[in-house]
Regions:
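Typically the conserved alpha-helix immediately C-terminal to a functionally engaged Cys/Sec
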Residues: 1-16
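Cysteine-centric redox/oxidoreductase cores and disulfide-bonded domains
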Residues: 26-180
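Intrinsically disordered, low-complexity regulatory regions enriched in Ser/Pro/Gly/Thr
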Residues: 15-18, 124-126
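General small-molecule cofactor/ligand-binding pocket signal
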Residues: 21-25
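Residue-level signal for beta-strand positions within conserved beta-sheet cores that form or flank
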Residues: 18-20, 64
Length: 180
């Protein structure tokens, strides 16, 4: 389902995907009335509009956007011309619907959603990617899988899933390593 990424590592911990409400907002800045992207210019913005369209086209699947993004990053430099088709299929999305959304106009199009995402980032003071919020609070430090998983499990008030014990094991190993 997922590639080898931070989100994959966390969500594959047993039961953790069931306690997480995952939302991604691509980071961009606003220049007059349009979004621009820092790291990869127009190509990064294009990828982000497609990812937002994946989210829009499968609103009941919070992980569709991640599946699309992970496929896209996994194919960078190899299948760029085919990424929309390949990655839409990987996330069980219709490539024509993806293209229509990503190249459309208006607030519900890919570019319109990217502009809204940039406005949200600005309003929250976000200026670096990734910036992670858990229950509305910004996670301090580098979001590694162990510290992010631990923060998620610590914030969860219900019965902890088995995957949370792996966060504790990772934290104990870190503490043990520091004692040596």
């Amino acid at each position: 389902m997922f590639g080898n990424t931070l989100a994959t590592e966390i969500l594959s911990a047993e039961g953790v995907a069931d306690i997480v409400s995952l939302t991604q907002h691509p980071l961009a800045r606003i220049n007059e009335s349009f979004a621009f992207c820092h790291h990869g210019g127009w190509y990064e913005c294009d990828m982000q509009t497609h990812a937002l369209c994946a989210k829009k086209l499968k609103p009941s699947d919070p992980f569709a956007m991640y599946e699309y993004i992970e496929c896209n990053f996994g194919n960078l430099g190899k299948n760029d011309a085919d990424n929309t088709r390949l990655c839409a299929a990987n996330a069980t999305l219709d490539k024509d619907d993806m293209w229509k959304c990503a190249t459309g106009y208006g607030p519900d199009s890919g570019p319109g959603m990217l502009l809204k995402s940039a406005q949200l980032a600005d309003s929250m003071g976000v200026n670096a990617a990734p910036t992670v919020f858990i229950n509305g609070k910004e996670l301090q430090g580098v979001p590694t899988a162990p510290n992010l998983l631990k923060a998620i499990c610590d914030a969860y008030t219900g019965a902890k899933p088995k995957g949370c014990s792996s966060a504790l094991v990772a934290e104990e190993k870190k503490i043990e390593k520091c004692r040596r």
